[in-house]
Amino acid sequence: MYTYTTIREIVDKLNLEILNEGNLDLKIDIPNIYQIGYELVGFLDKESDELNKYINICSLKESRFIATFSKERKEKVISEYMSLDFPALIFTKDAIITEEFYYYAKRYNKNILLSNEKASVTVRKIKFFLSKALSIEEEYENYSLMEIHGVGVLMSGYSNARKGVMIELIERGHRMVTDKNLIIRRVGENDLVGYNAKKREKLGHFYLEDIKGGYVDVTDHFGVKSTRIEKKINILIVLEEWNEKEFYDRLGLDVQYEDFVGEKIQKYIIPVRKGRNLAVIIETAALTFRLRRMGHNTPLEFLTKSQEIIERKKKEREEYMNTNRLPVTKLINEFDLEIKYGEDKVSSTYINSSNVYRPSLSLIGFFDLIEEVKNIGIQIFSKIEFKFLENLPPIERVNNLKKFLTYDIPMIVLTVDANPPDYFFDLVSKSGHILAIAPYKKASQIVANFNNYLDSFFSETTSVHGVLVELFGFGVLLTGKSGIGKSETALELIHRGHRLIADDMVKFYRNTQGDVVGKSAELPFFMEIRGLGIIDIKTLYGLSAVRLSKTLDMIIELQAVDNSDYMSAPSAHLYEDVLGKPIKKRILEISSGRNAAAMVEVMVMDHMSGLLGEK
């Protein structure tokens, strides 16, 4: 086992010719080489490792460039370069070696060597030799190594859980390197590669020890695609038995590391308890690592966005205290409205009710109804309203419009094809009202869309601690005490092809049809997993794994199993009131050996069969 090599050994192994012998016994402990370039024009970073610790390479291209210099310039550039502390300079095949290199090599006692290969081959051979010669190995007995989504995942800790989850991960299509007897080798400057140290009884077969001490032939059971000889290590998963008093990372900002062969590997501590699907959590950890390598720091993004929302909410509270008002800007942004007049008033105008009107009677001069309404809502104009105005005498229609525009209307919205006359624009402009154009031709479509949006905003709401998911088209709320496994169960359901609406805090409201609709708070699609921290479901699993809102059809409460009551009848006729509407509820008891996600799917399918008349 090597921790260093020497120039002499490199010369012998790579069959290099010695042009000038300096100190051939210089120790090399860095597996890097450097092909000179900037140095040829006199740019010398005299403090760099490249020019003081790495073996340097000069190819035919660089040597030809040097040969074009004047004698004075050669002297200056080469003398300064050769005075630095790099251990050796290797010229490749056919390189032009000027006399100045020989002169200053002798003066500074430098090793000058010649390769009989071209630059690309020389570089490749030296790198390969150094990576092998300088590798450091250590054996780790109770560690397992797998490749999951291309990520090298090292696992330690709770032995029985580790062996069980490895089988499930292999069944899911991932690859095993070793279940124990792991050797970790450091290659390059900071890369770690793991492989199995134990000799196998059958050549090319991989074995996994089960919890009873027997062995499973992974190669026979799952094929050669389920194994690989070695893998670069990226993350460490430590499995721990669940401890109620222990604090497990719930945000993911504080990155932990563990040292192996002098290098640090990022570590996740995953608590193991009944109902948690470890395979899905470990897969998610691997995907999260890849996401971070791509520059996405999900916990930091979550924290930054949360702070922005807190500041915005604080400012909104200071602006209009506890009044339930909707800024006009939100409606404009939601429906992509084009502002025609009144842009200067948009930021200071609020909508106080869900009322959306077409003016009709007001246009013929009947204003009794509009005067009785406490909060005048948004007014919609289409081609029909303007055709009606054209049938009125000119003086009457102008007077009616003037009277109409004296009321406190938050916003007037035109259909995209309304084509208003000039007098209408003049009157609205003088009145100071906000005039916008919607991207719809039918006024009824605008009224319906605005009503749905405004009703959801102004309706009574409630927030529930749980996870809202969509299964088979049904909106299902998972509830239960903290730590029971709601988020982990939802994570496996997402992995099975279902969709997330909201995690942790779900906001419910009644829509115009009377249905209870659930949606996320201000930050949708984030999920909190103990041990991993905050993960971004939309980024990890794609847009098909999420949706913004969903009607609530069923509640499933996760409970720890009560061993004294294990023969109890199922909870088939429970209901829970949400905003005045009874919602079907089932109890799911969590215990070892029960797959919570699969049980949730069965409960939803059972609910579906009941709706179809099956008993």
Swiss-Prot record:
It comes from the Bacteria. Catalyzes the ATP- as well as the pyrophosphate-dependent phosphorylation of a specific serine residue in HPr, a phosphocarrier protein of the phosphoenolpyruvate-dependent sugar phosphotransferase system (PTS). HprK/P also catalyzes the pyrophosphate-producing, inorganic phosphate-dependent dephosphorylation (phosphorolysis) of seryl-phosphorylated HPr (P-Ser-HPr). GO terms for molecular function: ATP binding; phosphorelay sensor kinase activity; protein serine/threonine kinase activity. Belongs to the HPrK/P family. One of its GO terms (biological process) is regulation of carbohydrate metabolic process. It comes from Fusobacterium nucleatum subsp. nucleatum (strain ATCC 25586 / DSM 15643 / BCRC 10681 / CIP 101130 / JCM 8532 / KCTC 2640 / LMG 13131 / VPI 4355). This is Putative HPr kinase/phosphorylase. ATP binds at residues 480-487. This protein is composed of two complete HPrK/P domains fused in tandem. This unusual organization may lead to a separation of the two antagonistic activities in F.nucleatum, with the C-terminal copy carrying the kinase and the N-terminal copy carrying the phosphorylase. Its EC number is 2.7.11.-, 2.7.4.-. Signal peptide: none annotated. Keywords: ATP-binding, Kinase, Multifunctional enzyme, Nucleotide-binding, Repeat, Serine/threonine-protein kinase, Transferase. PANTHER family: HPR KINASE_PHOSPHORYLASE, PROTEIN YJDM-RELATED. NCBIfam families: hpr-ser. GO terms for cellular component: cytosol. InterPro entries: HPr(Ser)_kin/Pase, Hpr_kin/Pase_C, Hpr_kin/Pase_Hpr_N, P-loop_NTPase, Ser_kin/Pase_Hpr-like_N_sf.
